[in-house]
């Protein structure tokens, strides 16, 4: 593989660059994400029992749902999902951070995890992927196989609406929380549909990829920040929109990271086969390559892309190496990080600005803090809560 070293680019060691040092899809948590035991306690005490009890009169249903939740969650690294907690704890007034509201914050984090998992369960069926995170996909091990897994995945995405009704219906921001989750569900399915249709075209383009990424990942990831801001008591639509814009870009970076790992990491390293290679997916890597390839490289690429033949997959990887894909990836991430930094500086809210800046620093610049970055957010964060 081509080395990431490039004299013209700064040394970056954030979460989306971990694969260069570890050669695999492993994410180190944000340095302030230290209370995951409390989060998982809420999952065990509240989320799993609530979801099981929706149809407790149906024989074997509660047991199936419990197994589904424990087997599939989290579908991706739960480090991505710290957005909701970071924003709430940093932005909400100390008086708002009661035990009840902290629990609700964890329920919002769980809401995002459930939506992520819905995406993964259905995506694995669509991609015909047998594995996720190094173990068999839910559709491979559940009773009923793909036929029932489809409905399991659909339920997973609807459980958040039930949780919101159970715990937020008397909150002033309830209707906005509900609307955000519904629109996230809709936009995600739009993005997934566009993504699958692109596999039939087998002609990856950046214009197509931007549409996929916006709906499938950008708006999806941004929903976590929107839910957290609303729960924190911010009612300014301008502030909410500006926050969503920043985290939409962050979500697009994360999706590009995932696309890049399909090229850069082996199936043993990232826990599943390279579905994008085999399905001719319109990913950032394939779309960027088509922008950069010479005519002869493009022809050779199209002859090999979308095949499970190992020699053809190797040819595609070699073509990516020829155009120095790691450098192109780094340039893309840095460009979008700079966009976010500009938007963050324009945020007219000090604590929200600190939360956004801290997340982007962790995502792109460094996985461990310098003294200044740790101190600034710690001043805003209710560390003892």
From Swiss-Prot:
Gene3D superfamilies noted in UniProt: Farnesyl Diphosphate Synthase
InterPro entries listed in its UniProt record: FPS1-like (IPR039702), Isoprenoid_synthase_dom_sf (IPR008949), Polyprenyl_synt (IPR000092)
MF (Gene Ontology): (2E,6E)-farnesyl diphosphate synthase activity; dimethylallyltranstransferase activity; metal ion binding; sesquiterpene synthase activity
Cofactor(s) this protein cannot do without: Mg(2+)
Domain of life: Eukaryota
UniProt EC number: 2.5.1.-
Cofactor remark: Binds 2 Mg(2+) ions per subunit.
Record GO cellular component, one term: cytoplasm
Pathway named in the protein's UniProt entry: Pheromone biosynthesis
Catalysed reaction, written as an equation: (2E,6E)-farnesyl diphosphate + H2O = (1S,6S,7R)-sesquipiperitol + diphosphate
PANTHER family recorded: FARNESYL PYROPHOSPHATE SYNTHASE, FARNESYL-PYROPHOSPHATE SYNTHETASE
Record function comment: Sesquiterpene alcohol synthase that catalyzes the formation of (1S,6S,7R)-sesquipiperitol, a terpene intermediate in murgantiol biosynthesis, a male-released aggregation pheromone.
Family note: Belongs to the terpene synthase family.
Protein known as: Sesquiterpene alcohol synthase
